[in-house]
C-alpha cells in the first residue's frame, strides 16, 4: 500500500495489523457514522465483493444479483448504489468508466472499481487473494491518476471475417487504460507476463485496432529493456514505469 506509516514499519506483521486496524476502526466506522448506515453487514459485504473483483467489469445490478444468489441478501439496488457512493466519497475505491474510443462516447455500464490503496484492499481480504495480475492493474491505475491523468477503461470495436458464417462480424476489444491529460493521450495495456507470441498478439490486438497517432504502451511485470516494435508499440517493465515519470515518452 501507499500509506506512509505502513511503509515505515519494520515488519510485515506490523504493517498488516496497522492496515487492518485502520480499515476497521477508521474507514468503516467513519463511513457508518457519517452516512448513518443501518445495514452495516451489507456495507461490509459490498467492500469484500469489490475487493475480490478488482479490475473486473461490474455494475450495481450485477452486484445485487451476487448478493441475492450467494449471500441471500435482499438489499435494494438503490441502497447498493448509495453504499458504493459512500466508499468512493471516503476515498476507499475509485470508479473507472468505460470509453468507446472510436465512438468517442462513454458507456454507462459495466464499469470497474479500483482501490485507492492496495494495502488496504489486501488487509480487507486478510492478505489471502493477492493476485499479482489484478494488483498490478490497480497499481498502474493509481499511478496514472497520481500523475494527473484522467483514466478510463477503453473499448474498441474491430471488424473481422467469420469464415463459418461467411460475413464480417464486430468484436469488442478492451484497452486497460485510456489516459488523458490535456491534448495528450496514451493507450496502456497491463500485461503481467508475455510468455509467448499468442499472448503478445492478444495484448496488441486492441491497440492495433486503433488508428490514431496517440502512443500505445504495454507494461509487463518483468524487468526488461524498453523497446518499441515495428507497430510503434512501446513495451516496458513495471518498475521503469513506476520510477520514471517521463517513461511514457520513451
Protein language model annotation of sequence segments:
Residues 56-67:
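Short acidic, hydrophobic short linear motifs in intrinsically disordered regions
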Residues 48-52, 68, 145:
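Short, locally clustered residues in the helix-turn-helix/winged-helix DNA-binding domain
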Residues 1, 17-20, 40-44, 61, ...:
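Non-catalytic, well-ordered alpha-helical scaffold segments
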Residues 79-250:
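A cross-kingdom feature that marks ATP-driven nucleic-acid transaction machinery
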Residues 31, 68-79:
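Short, positively charged loop/turn segments that connect secondary-structure elements
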Residues 40, 57, 74, 197-198:
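Loop/helix-junction capping segments adjacent to catalytic residues or to phosphate/diphosphate-binding pockets
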Residues 1-57:
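Interdomain motor-coupling "hinge/lid" segment immediately C-terminal to the ATP-binding subdomain
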Amino acid at each position: 500500500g501507499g500509506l506512509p506509516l505502513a511503509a515505515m514499519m519494520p515488519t510485515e506483521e506490523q504493517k498488516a495489523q496497522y492496515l487492518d486496524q485502520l480499515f476497521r476502526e477508521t474507514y468503516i466506522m467513519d463511513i457508518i457514522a457519517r452516512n448513518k448506515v443501518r445495514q452495516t453487514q451489507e456495507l461490509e459485504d459490498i467492500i469484500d465483493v469489490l475487493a475480490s473483483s478488482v479490475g473486473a467489469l461490474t455494475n450495481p445490478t450485477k452486484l445485487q444479483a451476487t448478493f441475492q444468489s450467494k449471500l441471500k441478501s435482499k438489499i435494494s439496488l438503490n441502497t447498493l448504489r448509495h453504499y458504493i457512493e459512500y466508499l468512493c466519497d471516503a476515498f476507499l475505491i475509485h470508479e473507472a468508466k468505460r470509453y468507446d474510443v472510436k465512438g468517442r462516447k462513454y458507456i454507462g455500464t459495466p464499469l470497474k472499481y479500483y482501490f485507492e490503496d492496495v494495502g488496504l484492499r489486501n488487509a480487507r481480504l486478510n492478505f489471502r487473494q493477492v493476485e499479482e495480475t489484478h494488483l498490478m492493474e490497480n497499481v498502474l491505475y493509481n499511478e496514472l491518476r497520481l500523475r494527473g491523468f484522467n483514466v478510463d477503461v477503453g473499448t474498441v470495436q474491430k471488424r473481422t471475417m467469420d469464415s463459418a458464417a461467411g460475413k464480417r462480424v464486430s468484436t469488442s476489444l478492451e484497452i486497460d487504460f485510456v489516459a488523458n491529460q490535456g491534448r495528450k493521450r496514451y493507450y496502456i495495456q497491463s500485461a503481467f507476463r508475455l510468455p509467448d507470441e499468442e499472448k503478445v498478439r492478444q495484448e496488441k490486438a486492441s491497440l492495433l485496432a486503433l488508428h490514431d497517432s496517440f502512443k500505445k504502451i504495454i507494461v509487463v511485470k518483468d524487468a526488461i529493456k524498453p523497446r518499441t516494435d515495428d507497430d510503434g508499440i512501446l513495451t516496458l517493465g513495471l518498475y521503469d514505469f513506476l520510477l520514471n515519470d517521463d517513461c511514457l515518452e520513451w
